[in-house]
Regions:
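Short beta-strand/loop motif that positions the catalytic acidic residue
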Residues: 108-109, 115-117, 121
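Short beta-strand immediately N-terminal to the catalytic nucleophile in serine-hydrolase-like folds
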Residues: 2-4, 31
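Conserved alpha/beta-hydrolase "nucleophile elbow" surrounding the catalytic nucleophile
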Residues: 4-9, 118
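Catalytic histidine neighborhood in serine/cysteine hydrolases
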Residues: 133-150
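Catalytic histidine-centered segment of alpha/beta-hydrolase-like enzymes
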Residues: 147-160
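Flexible "cap/lid" loop of the alpha/beta hydrolase fold
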Residues: 10-18, 23-59
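Conserved alpha/beta-hydrolase "acid-adjacent" motif
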Residues: 122-128
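Conserved alpha/beta-hydrolase catalytic His-Asp/Glu region
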Residues: 30, 38-42, 56-111
Length: 168
């Protein structure tokens, strides 16, 4: 059994969709998994575009030399904590991974899959779980009400109950 949360789910999807791997995967549990591209509103797309333009402008050496504290403060508030703490190379990897859509791989997964999701997840919304459930051939979805992206931490007893029932 392979179990993956968030980005770990993305890794498992890519692995399980391969034609052959050097070991057997009997079943998979994906928890609030990444892998489906987010649907962005026009306002969100515009915000991203403005961010990219501003970032290029603020990266100019002359501009930075004039306002280093302001620019450093602005940069310190951009992205997730993981992104802010990553090296520049790792940031590039994170951006590439987040923008990679794995939905075309989902029908290729041959193993039995259980999805466990928090209905209040904003990082990987419940909409993503429904897409995965629809596209993965042998798949079921368990939703933990009132939880977000870390459903297993927010309601551990309910999460454990789902896992125990599935793994019996």
């Amino acid at each position: 059994t392979l179990i993956g949360h968030s980005y770990g789910g993305r890794v498992i999807i890519k692995l399980a969709a391969r034609e052959s791997i050097p070991f057997e995967i009997t079943n998979i549990i994906l928890i609030d998994s990444a892998g489906v591209l987010p649907v962005r509103t026009t306002a969100q797309k515009w915000k991203i575009r403005k961010y990219k333009i501003l970032k290029k402008f603020l990266n100019m050496k002359l501009i930075y030399a004039m306002f280093p504290e302001v620019i450093d403060d602005w940069r310190s508030r951009q992205g997730s904590a993981d992104y802010r703490n990553a090296t520049p190379m790792m940031r590039q990897c994170m951006v590439k991974a987040v923008n990679e859509d794995l939905t075309e791989l989902l029908p290729k997964i041959r193993q039995e899959v259980l999805l466990i999701w928090g209905d209040q997840d904003t990082a990987t919304p419940i909409r993503d779980a429904h897409i995965m459930e629809e596209k993965i051939p042998n798949c079921g979805l368990a939703v933990i009400p009132g939880t977000g992206h870390f459903s297993f931490l927010e309601k551990p007893a309910q999460f454990r109950g789902i896992m125990e029932a599935y793994l019996k």
